[in-house]
C-alpha cells in the first residue's frame, strides 16, 4: 500500500487535472454556441443563393456546357480533397477518425489540401499526397477564409490542374454522434441544383436575367461554393467542440472516480498508520510497566 503522503500528492495532482478538463469543457461549450450562432446568422443568405442558382440552372444552354458542370471523362482523374481537421487535440478520436476515413477513400495519386494544424502535422513529410504550401487554420471559421479556399479551388479546376475536388469533414448527426463525410465541390452536380418541375402559374417558373443566365450563374456559383466550404468548416468546428466537450466530460468523470478510489485508499492508509501508532504506544507502555 502506498504511503499516505504519496496518496495525498496523487489526489492533489488529479484534482488539478480535473480543474483543467472541466475548464476545457466549459470553453468548448462556449465556442460551440458561438459557432452555431455564427452559422445560423449566414445560413439564410446561402440558402437564398442556392435557391437563386436553382432558378438559373434550367436556363443555362446545354451547349456549350459551363466549365463548373464539365465532368472530364478520364481514366485517372486528378482528384483533390479539402480536408477539415482541428487545430488542437484532446478531442477524442475526432482527428483520427477523419484521417482514417480520408485514407480509406483516397487513391495513391490524389492530393490532400488540409485545413487544421493536427491534420497537417500528421501528414507533413509522411504522406506525399499532402500539398504542403496549402496551410489554413481551422479555429473560428470565417467567410474570408472560405472565399480564399474557394478561389484557389476554382482556379485549379478551371486550369485543368484538378479534375475533381471534394470536401472531407465531420458532420454532426445528432446531439451525441458525428461522423466523417465526403461531398463533391467541383464539378457541380447539375441535377442536384435543378429544382423539381413547378406547376403552371408558379411565380418561380419564369425568371428574367440580365444580361443572361450564363453571366448570372458565373457570378453566383462561386458564392454558392463559398457557402458549401464555410458550412463544412463551421460544422466541422462545431463537431470538434462537441467531441472535445465529450472527451473532457469523460476525463472529468474519470478523475472524480479516481479521486474517490484514492480517498478510500488514503483513509485506509491513515487508519492503518494510526492503528500501528496506537499499537506501538500500547506496546511501549506495557514494556515500561513490565520493567517497573
Segments from the language model and where they lie:
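C-terminal beta-strand-loop-alpha-helix "lid" module of Rossmann-like NAD(P)-dependent dehydrogenases
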Residues: 1-292
